[in-house]
């Protein structure tokens, strides 16, 4: 078994798996994930790179503290303290979902540290709306892209809102199921889920209360993204709810040096569903001059 390191940064415990040698590649999980979400990447990438998989604040083996905060800002600061501790000079950064939003914000704040940026369906909410839990804020998106707006509303109605409600009532199994239904985009059973995803839900679902509360609060603007010079790879699934593709396509148009690749995958978790293709595409991108 690989050894996991845990240290305290920014007032919280962070854990990570560090394997391999060479150019560093740091993997940041999304909501309800942790370092284990990337094990199929770590095993392959560590043959060619120094692969580092991070558990963000409160993620397994950590535990959520009631009332704990997990903003984009805080997660960016956590990762900065971690990479300073690891003495990483320049590295590639891979982020999934909310972890992709964190990775983008990190690259915008510390571009000199980033060699390549890989964003797997990042939840960059400024492209959708600027304030959470207010349907009126979706009206501009309805006129821009009706399919993206309605799919995001379905995710909110089926996933985000009931998950938060179930967590507040300590109905953990219902919270896990509503989260999966909302993000996958159609009704599922927990038994149908990828075992790694289910493991992440089992151990991390309580962290969603903090992350969903502040996910819209980070001041990442279109103007600031247009100034980013980091080479960026955007990855989208061909089966995810439409709003993920909407964000990816808008990022591809906004970031000065970005390319978008679609991977056949049944859910938002491309790196779990299609690991061979995911690994091939990402490693090729990192290896490019």
Locate the predicted segments by residue.
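Active-site loop/oxyanion-hole signature of alpha/beta-hydrolase fold enzymes
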Residues: 43, 52-98, 109, 130, ...
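Flexible "cap/lid" loop of the alpha/beta hydrolase fold
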Residues: 115-163
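Active-site loop/turn elements of alpha/beta-hydrolase fold enzymes
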Residues: 56-58, 122, 265
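Conserved serine/cysteine hydrolase catalytic core
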Residues: 190-250
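Conserved HGGG/HGGXW glycine-rich cap/lid loop of the alpha/beta-hydrolase fold
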Residues: 8-68, 82
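Catalytic active-site module of serine/aspartate enzymes centered on a nucleophile-bearing elbow/loop
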Residues: 257-289
């Amino acid at each position: 078994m690989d050894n996991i390191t845990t240290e305290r940064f920014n007032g919280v415990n962070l854990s990570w798996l560090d394997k391999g040698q060479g150019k560093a590649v740091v993997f940041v999980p999304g909501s309800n994930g942790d370092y284990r979400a990337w094990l199929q990447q770590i095993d392959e990438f560590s043959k060619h790179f120094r692969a580092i998989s991070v558990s963000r604040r409160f993620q397994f083996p950590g535990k959520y503290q009631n009332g704990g905060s997990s903003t984009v800002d805080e997660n960016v600061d956590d990762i900065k303290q971690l990479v300073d501790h690891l003495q990483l000079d320049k590295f590639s950064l891979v982020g999934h979902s909310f972890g992709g939003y964190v990775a983008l914000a990190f690259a915008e704040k510390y571009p000199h540290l980033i060699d390549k940026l890989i964003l797997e369906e990042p939840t960059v909410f400024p492209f959708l709306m600027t304030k959470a839990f207010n349907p009126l804020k979706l009206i501009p998106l309805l006129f821009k892209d009706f399919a993206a707006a309605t799919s995001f509303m379905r995710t909110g109605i089926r996933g985000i809102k009931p998950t938060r409600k179930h967590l507040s009532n300590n109905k953990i199994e219902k919270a896990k199921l509503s989260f999966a239904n909302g993000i996958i985009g159609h009704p599922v059973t927990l038994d149908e889920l990828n075992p790694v995803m289910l493991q992440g839900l089992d151990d991390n679902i309580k962290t969603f209360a903090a992350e969903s509360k502040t996910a819209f609060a980070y001041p990442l603007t279109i103007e600031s993204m247009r100034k980013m010079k980091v080479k960026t790879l955007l990855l989208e699934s061909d089966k995810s709810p439409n709003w993920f593709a909407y964000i990816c396509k808008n990022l591809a148009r906004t970031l000065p040096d970005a390319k978008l690749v679609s991977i056949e995958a049944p859910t938002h978790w491309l790196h779990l569903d299609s690991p061979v293709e995911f690994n091939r595409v990402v490693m090729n991108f990192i290896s490019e001059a």
